[in-house]
Amino acid sequence: MSPAGCSHVNSFKVENWKQNLRVIYQCFVWSGTPETRKRKAKSCICHMCGAHLNRLHSCLYCVFFGCFTKKHIHEHAKNKRHNLAIDLLYGGIYCFMCQDYIYDKDMEQVAKEEQRKAWKLQVFSPALVSPYQYTMTGVGEKYSTWEPTKRELELLQHNPKRRKITTNCTIGLRGLINLGNTCFMNCIVQALTHTPLLRDFFLSDRHKCEMQSPNSCLVCEMSTLFQEFYSGHRSPHIPYRLLHLVWTHARHLAGYEQQDAHEFLIAALDVLHRHCKGDDNGKKANNPNHCNCIIDQIFTGGLQSDVTCQVCHGVSTTIDPFWDISLDLPGSSTPFWPLSPGSDAGVVNGESHVSGTTTLTDCLRRFTRPEHLGSSAKIKCSGCHSYQESTKQLTMKKLPIVACFHLKRFEHSAKLRRKITTYVSFPLELDMTPFMASSKESRMNGQYQQPSDSLHNDNKYSLFAVVNHQGTLESGHYTSFIRQHKDQWFKCDDAIITKASIKDVLDSEGYLLFYHKQFLEYE
């Protein structure tokens, strides 16, 4: 939003402009009574395409509603030279000359007054309002969630024929047609569409497309995809537009040959991140990628690297953003740890097998343990001012809301190409506290103690999706397990969705593991 104000509002501020603006806020934005809500639901459709969504805006000069996403309100502004419009969801004023939402003290005062009037007509409970809602009103005020009146409750009871969201509801479960070796894409789409915060973002129509051609925007297509998944339809969806856009924006994935699901995940997040730039709310980002787009809010964490000089023990620290954590496995050519007694390793038909039990926690311990860099990798120490041997240790500086663990099952080198089939046991609930940089610093200072419940909870995760690969490096197939509601699991094999048990999930090989934070704090 432009902080300096806008001179173009003067053309609107003519006789009775405040009254006209009040009518728009009362009838089509804040809607404080059942009558105005009915009027808004009936009247607020795009006058060009008839859509209810797509960020409807109302012209301030005439009676016209148009889609912001599809640029219909832009066409009206250009043809009629009506340069101001109001966002019917949040109440912000947009200037087509400035190409930005603008601030005007007088207009904001009208908006606040009409919003307060609307509150008085509703049952308002501050406890029901989340800080997230507080940041999205557009005028810096809170608003309440809908509370049905006694009459509305009676109407709901007398009209039972409606779709109910229950614990056994299958809304959100939908197969995907394999378009020719596209199982790598289908399994990632299943994981993303069942990521709770990502689902809430797209189903609330929060994306603000700023691309010249929305048809080339991957975020717009993902928004459509979420609408398809949660529409209640059960027939398999054909993701041909998604595949086309992926090929367009990630050329290395184009073609019908087999691709890697992990590579697709990172490419998809990268393109979504780039196409989400218009969704940044302008607030200071609280993640290492310094971006407030929905992708970085959910998936970005901070990895701390501490390099310690072996002579002066000086520490050089860097923090890098990450979207996933790639973990080495026993049986790879990368040194891991001595095999436990009774374990054995071998290679059969190009696949590496290791007997014995390895856990996800073991892999994380290995990932965060100090590593001696050796004489061939000396670095210049800022304390000694000379090249010295050092040790390097990785820890988690900031955890993402969704943590994705990539088990490195495919090994490619000049001499070797193989798949590692080592079984890795992974839990339904994961505590990342031992792998935090703060835990390491406490131990080094001799102050380590059992973390408090609140700190402990901040680092707790629950499993919600697993991607698996069956077959060999040369020929294989991807499937996924996804969690629906609290404890229902389903196996997604392209177009086929079947119910699965928790045992099925935990006994699977595991290639990509998706965990969601159990407790979230609004920032």
Curated annotation (Swiss-Prot):
The active site is at 183 (nucleophile), 477 (proton acceptor). Keywords: Activator, Cell cycle, Chromatin regulator, Hydrolase, Metal-binding, Nucleus, Protease, Thiol protease, Transcription, Transcription regulation, Ubl conjugation pathway, Zinc, Zinc-finger. GO terms for biological process: chromatin organization; protein deubiquitination; proteolysis. Zn(2+) 1 binds at residues 6, 8, 95, 98. It is found in: Nucleus. Its EC number is 3.4.19.12. GO terms for cellular component: nucleus. Zn(2+) 3 binds at residues 59, 62, 76, 82. It comes from the Eukaryota. Its main location: nucleus. Residues 174-518 form the USP domain. Zn(2+) 2 binds at residues 46, 49, 67, 72. InterPro entries: Papain-like_cys_pep_sf, Peptidase_C19_UCH, Ub_carboxyl-term_hydrolase, USP_CS, USP_dom, Znf_RING/FYVE/PHD, Znf_UBP. GO terms for molecular function: cysteine-type deubiquitinase activity; zinc ion binding. It catalyses: Thiol-dependent hydrolysis of ester, thioester, amide, peptide and isopeptide bonds formed by the C-terminal Gly of ubiquitin (a 76-residue protein attached to proteins as an intracellular targeting signal). It is an enzyme of class 3 (hydrolase). Histone deubiquitinating component of the transcription regulatory histone acetylation (HAT) complex SAGA. Catalyzes the deubiquitination of both histones H2A and H2B, thereby acting as a coactivator. Recruited to specific gene promoters by activators, where it is required for transcription. Component of some SAGA transcription coactivator-HAT complexes. Belongs to the peptidase C19 family. UBP8 subfamily. This is Ubiquitin carboxyl-terminal hydrolase 22-A. The gene is usp22-a.
